[in-house]
Curated annotation (Swiss-Prot):
The gene is rpsC. GO terms for biological process: translation. One of its GO terms (cellular component) is cytosolic small ribosomal subunit. The keyword rRNA-binding applies. This is Small ribosomal subunit protein uS3.
C-alpha cells in the first residue's frame, strides 16, 4: 500500500523552516530530550490557549522560545503574570536562561493544528464526526484556503470495527513542493476510545512561478 510522506517534513529547506534551530555534537541527545520536555510542558500548561507551534533556538546558555498562539492574551496573562510564571518554570526545567516570544496567529481557521484541535474537542463533546469535519471545512474555505482535507479514524459512532472517513474541498497538491500545505494531527478521547484527527490545508503557492517564454518573442 502507498503511504504518504509528512507534508511539512518534505518541504523543510524549500518553503518551510525547522521548529528547532541549534547545533550540537556531544549534547545532541540531551538537547533533543530537553526540546521534547519543553514542548510537552508548554502544551499541557497552555492547553486552552490555542497554541499551534513552539519554536526553540539555542545560543550558549540561553534558550529562545517562540510560541505561536491564537489567544496571546491568555498566554501573557494579566500584566504579563502568566508568561512570567511560564518563563520561571521553564528556567527551572532547563536550568538555562529562557526568553519567551509570543506570536499571534491572525487567522486560526487557516492553521491545521488549531483546526484539528477544534474537530477533536467537538468529537469529545459528542458532536457527529461528519458534522464536525464539514463545519471545519466550511470555516477554512471561507477564511481563504485554496483547499482542505480532513480525516477522522477510529471507532466512529461507537462502531465495533474501526474505520476512517475523510472529507475534502478544493485542491490539496501534496506533490507540489512550492505549495504551502499545513498539516497536523490531534487525538480525541471519547467514551469508545481514541479517535485520530488529521488535517491538510492548502494555503496557496509560496515561490513565484517562472513566466513561460513566448515562442518567437524577443
Amino acid at each position: 500500500m502507498g503511504q504518504k510522506v509528512h507534508p511539512i517534513g518534505m518541504r523543510i529547506g524549500v518553503i518551510r523552516d525547522w521548529d528547532s534551530k541549534w547545533y550540537a555534537e556531544k549534547d545532541y541527545a540531551d538537547f533533543l530530550h530537553e526540546d521534547l520536555r519543553i514542548r510537552d510542558y508548554v502544551a499541557k500548561r497552555l492547553s486552552d490557549a490555542s497554541v499551534s507551534r513552539v519554536e526553540i533556538e539555542r545560543a550558549a546558555n540561553r534558550v529562545n522560545i517562540t510560541i505561536h498562539t491564537a489567544k496571546p492574551g491568555m498566554v501573557i496573562g494579566k500584566g504579563g503574570s502568566e508568561v512570567e510564571a511560564l518563563r520561571k518554570n521553564l528556567n527551572e526545567l532547563t536550568q538555562k536562561r529562557v526568553h519567551i516570544n509570543i506570536v499571534e496567529i491572525k487567522r486560526a481557521d487557516l492553521d491545521a493544528k488549531l483546526v484539528a484541535e477544534n474537530i477533536a474537542r467537538q468529537l469529545e463533546g459528542r458532536v457527529s464526526f461528519r458534522r464536525a469535519q464539514k463545519q471545519a471545512i466550511q470555516r477554512t474555505m471561507r477564511a481563504g484556503a485554496k483547499g482542505i482535507k480532513t480525516q477522522v479514524s477510529g471507532r466512529l459512532g461507537g462502531a465495533d470495527i474501526a474505520r476512517a472517513e475523510h472529507y475534502s474541498e478544493g485542491t490539496v497538491p501534496l506533490h507540489t513542493l512550492r505549495a504551502d500545505i499545513d498539516y497536523a494531527w490531534e487525538e480525541a478521547d471519547t467514551t469508545y476510545g481514541k479517535l485520530g484527527v488529521k488535517v491538510w490545508i492548502y494555503r496557496g503557492e509560496v515561490l513565484p512561478t517562472k513566466k513561460n517564454n513566448v515562442e518567437g518573442g524577443k
